[in-house]
Amino acid sequence: MEMPEEPANSGHSLPPVYIYSPEYVSICDSLVKVPKRASMVHSLIEAYALHKQMRIVKPKVASMEEMATFHTDAYLQHLQKVSQEGDEDHPDSIEYGLGYDCPATEGIFDYAAAIGGGTITAAQCLIDGKCKVAINWSGGWHHAKKDEASGFCYLNDAVLGILRLRRKFDRILYVDLDLHHGDGVEDAFSFTSKVMTVSLHKFSPGFFPGTGDMSDVGLGKGRYYSVNVPIQDGIQDEKYYHICESVLKEVYQAFNPKAVVLQLGADTIAGDPMCSFNMTPVGIGKCLKYVLQWQLATLILGGGGYNLANTARCWTYLTGVILGKTLSSEIPDHEFFTAYGPDYVLEITPSCRPDRNEPHRIQQILNYIKGNLKHVV
């Protein structure tokens, strides 16, 4: 794998905080869409002995009060009710977005409270100065609305993390590199100039969630504080990094953030069943390094990623980037070793799909964003 030139957290000696406990991983494993993914990610990080270089922090479970800093009481109470009863056919569930892609399975409330608690715990570690980087790979569920589940997301832990960070940090930058538009986070902060949201995502007719065109820039006091970068299928590392760096350079200068929340969904990676972007962890790693060189308090979250082995490869590689470690190409023997066949290596090779992103169109988008950011004061 490409070598991080120096520890990405150089300049401060505090090790990153890594949110983990066996109980936490076990409950995160229960999400129907990504079964056992949390275990696969943690096991690979452990197989490379990266956990030994981080401060492992056991997450608290989010209280009803903490979750209600964003979500409505009515939604949380309904989620708790159907979770206890395992009632998938409750008549009120549809209005709360429960069903189809967010089934109201038994125990789903406990899952949501665990994830929310993981991200809040990570944010609190940053507030308390225990670290400069805090990692919750099981977080990053960016589609949930205040009163509605959406897109496999029952609780918007990213919003809860940002709200917690706002207790200390005046201006927070949210950067979303998932394949899908970070609509729930953008909506939550669309009227404020204290949180800037930046999302690079696939934007195409019929592709979920259907929002996030470049003309979506925020509302009221928050106008120009939402930045959307619509991207087409087939994009690879070099072009993606060029876009990401160009946008973040302008955003940083205009907004001057005091803390960063970075959502690193791995559904952009070649081999994902979404079959859209054609990225590798190296490209995402370069974007991550670009953010880390600001040396701000940084909260790292996961997100999508439906090829489970590739998601574990990606987030393990990115953990190595944060630590400034080069990882051996050969996957070490561990519990899930057989999932990494037939080659058993950490690298992911892009597929042969065409890149649908025309250079002139990309330049148009970048110019448009640069123009909008002139309004940010």
From Swiss-Prot:
Function: Histone deacetylase that catalyzes the deacetylation of lysine residues on the N-terminal part of the core histones (H2A, H2B, H3 and H4). Histone deacetylation gives a tag for epigenetic repression and plays an important role in transcriptional regulation, cell cycle progression and developmental events. Histone deacetylases act via the formation of large multiprotein complexes. Also involved in the deacetylation of cohesin complex protein SMC3 regulating release of cohesin complexes from chromatin. May play a role in smooth muscle cell contractility.
List of residues that carry Phosphoserine: 39
Species assigned in the record: Mus musculus
Family classification: Belongs to the histone deacetylase family. HD type 1 subfamily.
GO CC terms: chromosome; cytoplasm; histone deacetylase complex; nucleus
GO molecular function: DNA-binding transcription factor binding; histone deacetylase activity; histone deacetylase activity, hydrolytic mechanism; histone decrotonylase activity; Hsp70 protein binding; Hsp90 protein binding; metal ion binding
Residues annotated to bind substrate: 101, 151, 306
UniProt-listed GO biological process terms: chromatin organization; mitotic sister chromatid cohesion; negative regulation of protein ubiquitination; regulation of protein stability; regulation of telomere maintenance
Protein residues bound to a divalent metal cation: 178, 180, 267
Main location: nucleus
Subunit structure: Interacts with CBFA2T3. Interacts with phosphorylated SMG5/EST1B; this interaction protects SMG5 from ubiquitin-mediated degradation. Associates with alpha-SMA (smooth muscle alpha-actin).
Modulation of this protein's activity: Its activity is inhibited by trichostatin A (TSA) and butyrate, 2 well known histone deacetylase inhibitors. histone deacetylase inhibitor.
Reaction catalyzed: N(6)-acetyl-L-lysyl-[histone] + H2O = L-lysyl-[histone] + acetate; N(6)-acetyl-L-lysyl-[protein] + H2O = L-lysyl-[protein] + acetate; N(6)-(2E)-butenoyl-L-lysyl-[protein] + H2O = (2E)-2-butenoate + L-lysyl-[protein]
Annotated PANTHER family: HISTONE DEACETYLASE 8, HISTONE DEACETYLASE HDAC1-RELATED
SUPFAM superfamilies according to UniProt: Arginase/deacetylase (SSF52768)
Cofactor(s) needed by this chain: a divalent metal cation
Keyword terms, alphabetized: Chromatin regulator, Chromosome, Cytoplasm, Hydrolase, Metal-binding, Nucleus, Phosphoprotein, Repressor, Transcription, Transcription regulation
Free-text remark on how the cofactor is bound: Binds 1 divalent metal cation per subunit.
Subcellular location: Nucleus; Chromosome; Cytoplasm
Active site per UniProt: 143 (proton acceptor)
Protein name per the record: Histone deacetylase 8
Entry's EC annotation: 3.5.1.98, 3.5.1.-
